[in-house]
Amino acid sequence: LSIDPLSLNVDRWSAIHNFLSGMFCGQYPYGQQTHLGGYGSPFPVWQILHIPFYALGNVGMSIIIVTLLFLWTLNRLYSPKVALVVGILLCISPAFWYEIAVRSDLITNMMLSAIIAEWLVHKNVKLINNVVGIALLVGLTLSTRLIAVIPLCVLYGYEFLQLNWKKQGLFLLIILGTFTLTILPFVFWQGSTLLFFEYNPFVLQTRQGSFLVLLIFACGAIGIT
């Protein structure tokens, strides 16, 4: 974390930092460029979750905190041995250290999704009895990154197919409504930039892999389960 962030050729950290910096200065967040001239792709919930780290002066610290939370979850739900093994595997992983060095938040996002899924499994939270609550959670998770909902799709995909059409419709509407509510403040702020801008977060998140590919992957994972 002592590496000069401006010397990095990865701009995920500045996509968050500059978003929040612009927001607190009254400038439209999704119009703020990264230090490499790009634009931020994370959705609002993920940006807002980084406010404490922004206040501390380093949004890259989120990977440290979420990793510790992930290991604590494994220790609490499984055993200290499981947490230790996973911790060792992370420590010997070049990809993990790369994520830390460049202050990336992608693995952090996925670990947080895994933490949520692990607790839902541990608490035996069934979709049929918790349609509204789980839909709200999925909607908020969707407002981090599109790929972040894959663990929840795998977890609840089969149960969703067992619901009647009314509950299925309610579930999807609540997800869409929750996600929309997180986006609306930025639509009202400067909707043309968010919705019709060439580099809006919807475009950036699907540019390297279409939404159809994501949907096929999620459906395939559900089928396997």
Model-predicted regions and their roles:
Residues 2-8, 151, 157, 179-192:
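Transmembrane alpha-helix/helix-exit interface in multi-pass inner-membrane proteins
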Residues 151-176:
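Perimembrane helix-loop-helix junctions
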Residues 51, 94-95, 130-157, 181:
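Membrane-interface alpha helices of multi-pass inner-membrane proteins
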Residues 167-225:
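Membrane-lumen/periplasm interface segments of specific transmembrane helices
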Residues 47-49, 87-111:
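Aromatic- and kink-enriched transmembrane "portal" helix at the membrane-lumen/periplasm boundary
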Residues 2-59:
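Intramembrane catalytic core of multi-pass membrane enzymes that act on lipidic substrates
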